[in-house]
Amino acid sequence: MGKTLAEKILSEKSGSDARAGDIVIAKTDFTFMHCTTGPLAVRQFQSSGFERLADARKVAVFLDHAAPTPNAEMANDHLFLRSFADKTGCLMHRVGDGICHQLVAESFASPGDVVLGADSHTTTGGALGAFSTGMGSSDIAIACALGKTWLRVP
């Protein structure tokens, strides 16, 4: 029997013969966070002792969910994320650039890619033939640092 699209992509990205139910370590092509999930991901990144991204060109921060910021706490989160982007060199999408999952679909996700986002709409990239899934902030932090993640093949 043939493979599903997810099995094909995750086989390629893990260097294994991935089948549904398998747990694989897969290379990532793009990882992103936004202004409500990003602060937790960045704090996890920092508390894990990471200082550098695996590839800054493959990581993005989007200031899109609380824009303009409704309170001082969110304004401070925006500053915190901008500082992280400045220090690491990751891509930074500012207020007004657009909503993360739409921009990822338009500019960053391609067929055969593994795309991870700290956003429930990350699966939008699947329409382009990418394996695109949402993850929690801790997993996003690790993927940013290592350029890979563990996944159970669907």
What are these regions (language model features)?
Residues 1-154:
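Fe-S-dependent hydro-lyases/dehydratases of central metabolism
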